[in-house]
Amino acid sequence: MASAPVKAAAGAGAAQINDFLAYSTGAAEQRALQNPTVSRSKDLLASLIGCLEMRHYSKQWTGERYEEIYLPVEPWMEQPDPKVTRNFFYSNIFSDLFFHGRAFAFVTSRYSTGLPASFTWLPAAMVTTPNQTGPQWFGPSDVVQFNGVEIGDSNDVIQFLSPIQGLLYQGARALSIATHLDQAADRYATLETVPGYLQQKGGETLDSDSLSEIAAAWSAMRRQNAIGALNDYVEFKEFSVSPAEVVGEQRKYQSLEIARVSNIPAYLVSAPQEGSGLTYTNVQDSNRQLYLYGAKPFIECIQQTLSASNVLPRNRFVKFDIENYLEEEMHDVMVEPYVDISEESPS
């Protein structure tokens, strides 16, 4: 199927589109990605979605059901943004859906029919919609601002709306707890000795200032030397339960909470679960579970948005080739080893 001639997209759009010096994904997203479980969850899903091929088809009624008739792909289906790879484009579209619950692509050129021919990704953190402040998005916005500049024609912006609220909203409490636990672990990592306290054993009772001076001197000495010195009147005592161990257990549990709010099977992000282990069945089904529980809502959001009438003609659709992906991955992931258990014949 020959592509129609291409012409520039109507409307100048926001002045700062493609001015990458002004681009930002937002402090909240960058802070969330510092958590290893969040980073792992996002990367697992992005590696799946960003690597899928796109298929182009129409539907034909057979008298009993609709049959998919596959068509040649348009150039933008292979490379939505001519300046970057398909992997880059869709991975970032997914990332915005994952964190913000919506994503945006600006139409940079159109066919002679008026339908989009190419796109560029707009970071969701830089997009504002005056009539919707979130976290629940109720539909496409008629007024779209990019970095504070209103885009002249909102039809030049393809708006992807996730069926799931963004992680930065629905996971705000879990992320806050995880951040505080990471900060506590960072503090304990700088301790020169085991956590404990100094206790006066005898002599004249010291006031708070004197006790503070002794504690500061003890801490400073421990930072400089492996051995500290105390007199007969002061004793160092370890805490019965190490705060570092308590924080460690809390961080393990919080990694499980992050996996839950990310809709990722816990074992895929190495989050510990009581009474469970990684079995052969888990490994064999991992890609299918990642798709069903984590990636499918985002995949459906992207392919249905790009199949809408403002992108494709009537009865034309696109979808990711998830069937071949799962078939190939399930075949290559793991082959159950053959073990010869035949009994030795008695001598």
What do these predicted ranges mean?
Residues 96, 277-278:
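Short Asp/Glu-rich motifs
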Residues 284-319:
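Long, compositionally biased
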Residues 259-262:
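Short amphipathic alpha-helical "interface-anchor" segments enriched in bulky aromatics
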Residues 227-228, 266-277, 308-312:
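Short acidic alpha-helical/loop segments enriched in Asp/Glu that coordinate divalent cations
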Residues 1-247, 253, 257, 329-347:
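Structured, contiguous alpha/beta core segments that scaffold functional sites
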Residues 242-245, 283-287:
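Short glycine/threonine-rich loop-to-helix capping motif typified by GTGT followed
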Residues 237, 278-280:
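Beta-rich nucleic-acid/ligand-interaction surfaces
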